[in-house]
């Protein structure tokens, strides 16, 4: 019920209040028509981490300018055709929202802001289209002022850097990866380990989202952006590697080969010693030699070969991860030439995006706006412009959620709860206030208290709803005016927009956790089907980036869905392993003779058919024919002499283990 009173929370609330009051003061000093917009904006853009405020600031300003330009272009030209104007603004908001949802970086704010800013400026200006340019300039200055004040205060007054938080998250993640590897090598229950470590995928996605703010950070760690990117690539690869390693250890149960057992013990000792880089290079060379030493085509031999290949890749990823981690404390820490080059690579890994859902969200926003406009026009409601404006804002604010309706309802309820407080201030307290210093003292108690809740993700929505409702209802201007009719009309418009946002979103856009999880699974299965049918391997880290991102989103949804019938037998981590095995197999394909390629292609086509059937809702059990195809491909690849054959065999062994964990042991030769 009560907020946390730690140092970071108190400082955030004080900084946010200072930024809001600074924006309000400058707004008064400049004679802006609605200085309260600057105050409200300062709270909306405030974030606990300074880098997050700074990274979004530029995109927010650009989005506001673009939205204002759209309003200036549309309103004067279509004001005499109200239906067309409403349609144009609704389509603008819906289109901007849909495109913004395809980008989960701070860049998305540019288009989202440009969408609902056009509505904020355009709809209230229909009665005075000739003044649209002046109104647009005023709104841009007011909103830009709020963004600027929040950015300056959170950057200069005891900023909390993203880099410090990110460094701790990376250190914790790498430590958990080390413990996962040790648990696997000590022979712990592989399935239980994988289940316990699935949250590492969600943590990897969270780290990626934090990392996008790092170039804008206030600390010197912003110079380590390339190191974080390279580190994240190793994280993406480690999740399927460690999961696959656990599977091979579980399949082998007991390893009698003394050299292999000694290698496993050496890897265990190396991890326990802190994964020193020099010893890691020696271990990788030793493991690669062991893996290249052919032990025949028996199933146990192929499993050992696959185990050693996985172990070598795991040691490499862990060694590189620890070497990169050392760069945070020592910028001159040595790196191999290849690793050094990876820290200088540009670009960003792709993340999961759902185009159909984005289009549906944009369509729902457009329809909610049009229904609000119809109510406004047909009722002849003079102050009804607030309805389509708030419909646009609500649909945009919560579009990224699976089911936005509960959040929109909650926002509406807390906005309603803010009205009694707003009325007390407007009609009882503010009329007695004279001068800005006294206004600041009067506004401090509610705003400072609400600011304590914003850093808590569970309570931030409720706090912002009360705060925005309170601030917008007061509508502080240079000359105070308390008009009950305007107060009631403006707030009524908000709730009409809220109502249409709820109705349309519930009818078109909302989905439960089951449906959301199912969509993600289907997208993953379709990706695996396409990869299996391709004849060229994608870059491993790039493919892993999307699969791990989906796994991070999917894991909490599957946990919430529980053991429902639709998800019995679903293992998202297994699907990730299958994907990385397919990458390894596709990479080995080009070095095979024609007969080996034909066998491999038949197996890959069978895997593609299996996952395409899964995506279409067919039974989950793979066919015996697919097992026969994989075994035929294994017979050809296990005797191949190409250097890439070890990785190919490891990939096929992984496919067999993941798709047919209960199948009898592979038979190398068919008796004639």
Task: Give the ranges of each region predicted by the language model.
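A transmembrane helix-and-boundary motif of multi-pass membrane transporters/channels
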Residues: 1-216, 223, 323, 327-571, ...
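Soluble C-terminal extramembrane regulatory/interaction domains of multi-pass membrane proteins
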Residues: 173-184, 188-189, 228-344, 581-672
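Extended amphipathic alpha-helical scaffold segments
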Residues: 181, 199-218, 246, 282-294, ...
């Amino acid at each position: 019920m009560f907020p946390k009173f730690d140092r970071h929370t108190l400082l955030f609330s004080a900084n946010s209040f200072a930024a809001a009051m600074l924006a309000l003061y400058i707004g008064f000093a400049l004679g802006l028509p609605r200085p309260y917009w600057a105050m409200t904006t300062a709270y909306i853009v405030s974030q606990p981490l300074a880098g997050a405020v700074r990274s979004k600031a530029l995109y927010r300003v650009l989005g506001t300018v673009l939205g204002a330009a759209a309003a200036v272009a549309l309103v004067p030209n279509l004001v005499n055709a109200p239906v067309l104007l409403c349609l144009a603004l609704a389509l603008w908001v819906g289109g901007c929202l849909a495109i913004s949802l395809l980008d989960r970086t701070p860049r998305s704010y540019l288009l989202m802001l440009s969408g609902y800013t056009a509505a904020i400026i355009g709809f209230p200006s229909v009665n005075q289209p000739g003044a649209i340019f002046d109104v647009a300039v005023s709104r841009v200055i007011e909103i830009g002022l709020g963004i600027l004040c929040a950015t300056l205060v959170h950057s200069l007054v005891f900023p909390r850097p993203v880099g410090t938080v990110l460094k701790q998250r990376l250190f914790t993640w790498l430590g958990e990866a080390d413990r996962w590897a040790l648990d696997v090598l000590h022979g712990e229950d592989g399935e239980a380990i994988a289940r316990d470590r699935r949250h590492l995928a969600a943590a990897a996605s969270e780290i990626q989202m934090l990392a996008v703010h790092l170039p804008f950070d206030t600390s010197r760690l912003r110079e380590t952006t390339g190191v974080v990117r390279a580190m994240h690539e190793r994280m993406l690869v480690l999740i399927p590697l460690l999961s696959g390693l656990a599977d091979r250890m579980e399949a082998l149960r007991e390893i009698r080969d003394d050299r292999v057992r000694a290698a496993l013990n050496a890897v265990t000792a190396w991890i326990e010693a802190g994964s020193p880089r020099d010893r890691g290079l020696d271990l990788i060379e030793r493991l690669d030699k062991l893996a290249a030493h052919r032990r025949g085509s028996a199933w146990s031999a192929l499993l050992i070969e696959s185990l050693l290949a996985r172990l070598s890749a795991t040691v490499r990823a862990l060694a590189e991860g620890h070497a990169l981690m050392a760069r945070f404390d020592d910028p001159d820490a040595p790196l191999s030439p290849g690793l050094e080059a990876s820290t200088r690579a540009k670009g960003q890994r792709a993340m999961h995006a759902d185009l159909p859902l984005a289009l549906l969200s944009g369509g729902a926003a457009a329809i909610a706006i049009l229904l609000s406009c119809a109510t406004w026009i047909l009722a002849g409601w003079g102050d009804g412009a607030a309805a389509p404006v708030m419909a646009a804002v609500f649909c945009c604010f919560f579009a990224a959620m699976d089911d936005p309706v509960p959040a929109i309802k909650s926002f509406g309820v807390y906005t309603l709860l803010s009205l009694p407080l707003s009325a007390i201030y407007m009609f009882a307290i503010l009329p007695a206030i004279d001068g800005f210093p006294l206004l600041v003292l009067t506004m401090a108690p509610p705003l400072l208290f609400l600011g304590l809740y914003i850093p808590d993700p569970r309570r931030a929505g409720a706090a912002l709803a009360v705060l925005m409702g309170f601030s917008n209802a007061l509508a502080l201007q240079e000359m105070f005016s308390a008009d009950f009719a305007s107060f009631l009309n403006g707030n009524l418009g908000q709730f009409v927009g809220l109502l249409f946002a709820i109705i349309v979103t519930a009818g078109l856009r909302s989905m439960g956790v089951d449906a959301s999880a199912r969509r993600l699974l289907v997208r993953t299965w379709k990706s695996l089907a396409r990869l299996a049918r391709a004849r060229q391997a994608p870059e491993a880290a790039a493919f892993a980036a999307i699969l791990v991102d989906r796994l991070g989103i999917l894991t909490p949804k599957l946990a919430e869905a529980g053991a429902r019938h639709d998800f019995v037998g679903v293992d998202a981590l297994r699907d990730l392993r299958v994907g990385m095995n397919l990458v390894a197999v596709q990479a080995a394909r080009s070095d095979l003779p024609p007969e080996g390629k034909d066998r491999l292609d038949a197996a890959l086509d069978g895997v593609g058919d299996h996952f395409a059937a899964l995506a279409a809702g067919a039974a989950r059990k793979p066919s015996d024919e697919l097992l026969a195809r994989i075994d035929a491909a294994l017979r050809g690849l296990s005797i191949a002499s190409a250097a890439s054959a070890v990785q190919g065999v490891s990939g096929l062994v992984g496919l067999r283990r993941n798709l047919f964990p209960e199948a009898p042991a592979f038979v190398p030769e068919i008796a004639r």
